[in-house]
Amino acid sequence: MSKEERIYFENELLARLKSLEWPGLTLTAVKKGLKFRLGKELVAQLDFQYLVKAQAYTLLGRVFGGPIFECCSKIVPPYRSNLGSDACFSFTTSGRQDKRFSTNVYGTISAPEIEEVGAVCSHIRAALENYYIPLVAGCILPSQRTIEDVLASPTDYAYPALFIRCAVAFKPEIISKEKLKEVMSNKKIVKNKDFDLSLLSVLEDLAVG
């Protein structure tokens, strides 16, 4: 892929992403990504990373603001974060085999030929709209899917038990008693029994059903 072809593709992708929206948040398409604001505060980003040798793109996401992040920042767990950053949630599609971003098992989308640009841009927009934007939004403003997302991939969260505690404290109706039991029995969420279970047990009175 020539530099000119790459610039053309990235400009076309930017144009396709400009109309994306999410309730309660302001989404701004920028070159190689999407920014999320809560009010005027920048709280999260989705970024496309170009891999020169592979001539392909991966998608990265980070949440570093919002009510859940602020709550998590006030408590220091007695063990290491799953993440190598200050974010409360972070992921990369590189190496993921879920095929949500790409159709291959590498988690990458090959840089398209000129005649394929339209189709690839449509595919990426659909992937963001249907999965990645709701995923990131649920880490900023808790919703019914927030707990399910943590259960699906706990290692994408700095401290998954603390994250759930803060999300439910902000919006108690997002968890049921049955779901709380599932959370408390998950070894990838409960990494330190004394600390994490004490955090989560507080939610028993808040859980519905």
What are these regions (language model features)?
Residues 6-28:
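Amphipathic alpha-helical segments
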Residues 28-35:
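Long, charged, glycine-rich C-terminal linkers/tails
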Residues 2-10, 35-209:
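Intrinsically disordered, low-complexity regulatory regions enriched in serine/threonine/proline
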